Curated annotation (Swiss-Prot):
Protein name (database record): Molybdenum cofactor sulfurase 3
HAMAP family: MOCOS
PROSITE patterns, per database record: MOSC
GO BP: Mo-molybdopterin cofactor biosynthetic process; molybdopterin cofactor metabolic process
Cofactor requirements of the protein: pyridoxal 5'-phosphate
Gene from which this protein is expressed: mal3
SUPFAM superfamilies: MOSC N-terminal domain-like (SSF141673), PK beta-barrel domain-like (SSF50800), PLP-dependent transferases (SSF53383)
Length: 764
């Protein structure tokens, strides 16, 4: 057992150093989502670019040279799987999903043929049910499939049925014995009489780090994606068809290059004879296909074959040992009361490389055994520069089985608002998904240690705190008998520092005047936030309403004054588009001078400052009120009393070098309206709010992310208070409430919010 708790690299020291040099762009990030996509090497991309720059690659329908090169790539791919073109035809597709769809559309079932699929399959396999040419569609459980290894009943029917199962489950990396292929082809499936089955192997997850030997195991169809193996190119995959199964496919649609003749005036055509030429519609992604050669070359150079072991077999060894190290280390973690910190979702204990790939799936448990939501874990991982995957990973069957959810449970979660890919991670205390980490040939032991350190730091409570708790924070502040508006905060530039107002501020049709009116974008036009650049909080805008100027300050820069009058719609301006919270937004470029100032301040070249166009109309579906560049509401209300209560719940501020103040904690929540009430959390019951003479509707609670773990005064990341919010609210990462103005004036007249106004919250 002690040996399994340690990790021994399968690479030489020289190999490990050469690999690490190829991925220096990771810097301090720990990438642990190789089941999602592995990473491409620096030299791989340079080689691809050099090839494109030095060669003339024409359309393969134009140039025989390009066509011959594509054939060489086909041979190289088949050789990787230890087979040749006399055994398998390789049809290029856009990926595994497209391969499965093509098979489902083309497979010719006999009148009584059945389509059978493993329940623990990818969503793309489940989607085949909608278009296969048979009504006999059946799922098979994992246990039932494995029983076919012992089957001896031979199939002699002419019925042509089809079964699809993965070589490796993308949920937790369990491998299915490839002996099943031959067994099912010969004996059929128990419970289906004498029906003859052809086998489709979903190999996408398996071939990323394991050797698929098609000379030993010969499924009728194999589906895969190349980015899982090489990281680049994306949007390219293959359907491998065994020559004995080629006649089972009947193509319906035909595109360019797939016919001998096609007539425009008559509905007549004749398809080409070779299978590949019939099925590859239009012009192939030929430059991407050619790039596969650099992928193979890079793998074999960085992880060279040794006596008796191919490159991919060595990679399989390395990733298995990484997975076993991670699995056993997580399994050994304990809370102070002896309870497990992690619940693992596995079908093996990482004893056998032939039965387990380099994927570890788990959820984290609190000390009392309750679940930590996967969204919270994802936020914490992001704070620690760890990239991992959460959810159900497009494998609802495996997810449901391991989380022990009935069909009724899944439907109940859906009715409660949970959908695939959202952050609704706990419903009634039960998880809707989990956390997955996965490993590639370039993964280091240090990457896993970073994950383990994060889990221990964030979820194993220490017995001694450093003393920065409520006693010190509360003593400096008094409570108020009547709720009042203490401060107005606006954020002129999205994700930058706050402009704090303690007197009064005007409203616009979008919320606070000038609030989140500007956004910083990178050289690709992508909006930046503190999730990517925490230093953005150090840029602090100030608005002068009299002069209509915005002054930008930064600790290391001279102030920059931007004349807002020069950004009017009537001026000669540069309009552009960016995307904010999934919305396309029309904006005005604020010019080169401020762009240069921001780029220097944030030490990032190519940044631009954009202002939302006055003509832009952006709304959020729940309130229907116009909003600026805020995430989803006109206003965010934060209660100081609730922040104080939350601070009392934080067990340890060990990442801070000095005692936190209430003001600094309030700043983390980036609220617009800072109120003080006699009791904490009473805002959670409000449905409507009156502040002075203005009325607001409550749009709902604010879901929090890792942004609240950034100290707005320094840009330093901490694990609190997000960790405590997740624990105190049973995984619901909510704090603060969204408001929208009920009766905004649209005739140009101004309405004002006044600090120290009485706040009245109505619960009905």
């Amino acid at each position: 057992m002690e040996a399994m708790m340690n990790f021994t690299s399968q690479y030489t020291v020289e190999e490990a150093l050469a690999i690490e040099k190829e991925f220096s762009r990771l810097k301090e990030k720990c990438y642990l989502d190789h089941a999602g996509t592995t990473l491409y090497a620096d030299s791989q991309i340079r080689s691809v670019c050099e090839g494109l720059a030095q060669n003339l690659y024409c359309n393969p329908h134009t140039s025989r040279t390009t066509e011959d090169l594509l054939d060489q790539v086909r041979y190289r791919v088949l050789r990787h799987f230890n087979t040749r073109s006399s055994e398998y035809s390789l049809i290029f597709t856009s990926g595994t999903t497209a391969s499965l769809k093509l098979l489902a559309e083309s497979y010719e079932f006999a009148p009584e043929g059945a389509f059978v699929y493993l329940k623990d399959s990818h969503t793309s396999v489940l989607g085949m049910r909608e278009i296969v040419g048979t009504e006999r569609i059946y799922p098979v459980e994992r246990e039932q499939l494995l029983k076919e290894l012992d089957s001896s009943e031979r199939s002699d029917s002419e019925h042509s049925s089809l079964i699809v199962f993965p070589a490796q489950c993308n949920f937790n990396g369990v491998k299915y014995p490839l002996e099943l292929v031959r067994k099912i082809q010969r004996n059929g499936i128990s419970g289906y009489g004498k029906e003859r089955f052809r086998v489709c192997l979903d190999a996408a997850s398996f071939v990323s780090t394991s050797f698929l030997d098609l000379s030993k195991y010969q499924p009728d169809f194999v589906c895969l994606s190349f980015y899982k193996i090489f990281g680049y190119p994306t949007g390219l995959g293959a359907l491998l068809v065994h020559h004995t199964a080629a006649d089972q496919l009947r193509k319906k649609y035909y595109g360019g290059g797939t016919v001998k003749i096609a007539m425009a005036g008559r509905n007549f055509h004749v398809k080409r004879d070779p299978l590949v030429e019939r099925f590859e519609d239009g012009t192939l992604a030929f430059t991407s296909i050619i790039a596969l050669l650099q992928g193979f070359e890079t793998l074999e150079r960085l992880v060279p074959s040794t006596a008796g072991l191919r490159t991919i077999e060595r990679i399989s060894q390395q990733t298995f040992h990484l997975g076993r190290y991670c699995y056993n280390r997580l399994k050994a973690l304990r809370h102070s009361n002896g309870n497990a910190v992690v619940k693992l979702y596995h079908d093996t204990g990482f004893e056998d490389q032939g039965l387990q790939g380099g994927i570890v799936n788990f959820n984290i448990l609190h000390e009392d055994g309750t679940y930590v939501g996967f969204a919270e874990v994802s936020y914490m991982a992001s704070l620690h520069n760890i990239l991992l995957r959460t959810g159900c990973f497009c494998n609802p069957g495996a997810c449901q089985r391991h989380l022990q959810l009935s069909d009724e449970d899944v439907l109940k979660q859906f009715d409660a608002g949970h959908v695939c890919g959202d952050a609704n991670d706990l419903i009634d205390g039960q998880p809707t998904g989990s956390v997955r980490v996965s490993f590639g040939y370039m993964t280091r032991k240090e990457d896993i240690d970073c994950l383990l350190e994060m889990v221990e730091k964030c979820y194993i409570r220490k017995t001694i705190a450093n003393g920065f708790t409520r006693t010190q924070i509360v003593s400096k502040y008094k409570s108020y008998d009547q709720p009042r508006l203490k401060m107005i905060c606006l954020f002129p530039i999205k994700s930058c520092g706050a402009f704090k107002v303690t007197t009064r501020w005007p409203l616009s049709r979008r919320g606070l005047k000038h609030d989140r009116e500007f956004v910083i974008v990178d050289e690709n036009g992508v909006a930046l936030t503190q999730k990517k650049l925490t230093e953005m909080c150090l840029i602090r805008p100030q608005i002068n309403l009299k002069t209509n100027e915005m002054t930008l300050s930064h600790p290391s820069m001279d102030d920059f004054v931007l004349d807002l009058d020069l950004l009017g719609e009537s001026q000669r301006i540069k309009l552009c588009q960016t995307k904010v919270c999934q919305d396309n937004v029309q904006a005005i470029d604020c010019g080169d001078q401020v762009a240069e100032w921001i780029s220097v301040a944030l030490q990032t070249s190519g940044l631009r400052l954009l202002k939302q166009s006055d003509e832009e109309v952006r709304t959020f579906q729940q309130s229907k009120q116009e909003i600026a560049l805020a995430n989803q509401a006109q206003f965010l209300l934060i209660n100081q009393a609730s922040v104080r209560w939350l601070a009392d719940k934080v067990p340890d501020w060990d990442e801070l070098h000095e005692e936190p103040t209430l003001e600094s904690l309030v700043d983390r929540f980036r609220g617009n309206l800072i109120v003080e009430t006699p009791t904490s959390m009473e805002e959670c019951d409000w449905k409507r709010v009156t502040i002075g003479y203005l009325e607001f509707a409550v749009d709902g609670p604010c879901s929090r992310c890792q942004m609240i773990c950034i100290d707005q005064g320094t840009g330093v990341k901490t694990t609190e208070p997000l960790r405590t919010i997740g624990r105190e609210f049973k995984g619901k990462m909510r704090f603060g409430i969204y408001l929208s103005h009920v009766n905004p004036l649209r005739d140009g007249s101004e309405q004002w919010l006044y600090c120290n106004s009485v706040v009245e919250g109505l619960s009905e």
